[in-house]
Amino acid sequence: MKATMFLAGLAVASAIDNEDLRPSFIDWTSKHGKSYAGAEFEQRFQIYQSNHAYISSHNARHSAGLTSFTVAHNQFSAMTNREYRNLLQKKNRPRSAGAAASFVADQADPAPDNFDWRPLGVVNPVKNQASCGSCWAFSATAAMEGAFNQKHNGTGVPSQCSSYKCGPNDTPCCSFSEQEVVDCTLNGADTCNKGGEMHDGVLEIVNNQKGKFNTESQYPYTSGGGTSTGQCNAKPATAVTTGITGYANVTHGDEKALKQAAYEHAIISIGIDASQNSFQFYSSGVYDEPACHNTIDQLDHGVAIVGYGIDTSPSPSPGPGPGPSPGPGPADCPDQNTEKACKADTGCFWCNDPGIGGFCFSFPCGQEENNHGTPFKRNLLTAGSAGPAPSPAPSTGTDYWIVRNSWGESWGMNGYIWMSRNKDNQCGVACDSIYALM
């Protein structure tokens, strides 16, 4: 009898607790532009409650030090995991069919421990595929943008791209049309509901468009509502001549090679397994999901690597925060004015410029500006300069990839996720990775 009364009490308490979430759910519908009525409202509210319970449970484990990342409500809060997975529309066709090359590491320019292309004016703001399964097109376009913007380095950018700026210094850059890739690749066969492959998107621009690519404003994204016409409306007469000639594969399953490729070739297009609830609601920290698959046949989402680093913080702070910036802050290193003192300070880098001399600062040579405001961009270092300094002392922190998603800035860390690196190719990050060639 007492047990029955206790269970009944739990049921009532649970109902009251769940009902307390109704205002939160109503706020969520308003924030995300959702409109539900009648039975559908109650159904979505039930799903929201279930997801809320998962989020609360996971974050309690994080507070107890049992997991390295947090989760939070986002645009998927009223979706079941099955509905969410339907948005993941990366296909897995053989990636080697049209590769023009395979990655060969530059042994003379080894990758530093931390690197991030975002401060260098190469990476566009995070975009949003919305309800269309077009992740593959966003991933492929990001790789082509990365190659183009890296080569131009803010100079000689075509007039069609005059409205685009990248990075904290508003570096002139180009932003290309994902809608063109969706509509034109394989004659429009890869619609929102059928998915596609990143390398096919690159080959569409190279082979069928002859290297010409419309900008985002010339050919705007219209498939966010979940539909695409499959009608190619590319306008080659006004498109940018990109100089993109193909794509290169990075060695399957080799995270060391992937790190070097990410350092040398800006944005890397990759496929991952993003099917878990934990990815659906990821908020901050290094994503470490043992249930993630690491085989190429189970990759279901296309994203882009824009850098990598080592997390040395004792525990991630919950909730979304600013975009990740590996290494100490800009003011941590300039006082180390000798090469010996700089190299002895973990996280600081000694870099030389032929016209100015050596300086110590908190990002790898070629990634930031020194305290005199002189840019040390890798591809601008003149002959005879020191180039990247030796890596700092090994850290006991967690290795991660800086991954740019295409679900808008409200997801994750302003649209980004730190994914585990050097952890048995977790989530298949190194299974299907390519970069654009110029």
Residues covered by each model-derived region:
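Short, flexible beta-strand-to-coil junctions
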Residues: 12, 272-275, 351-357
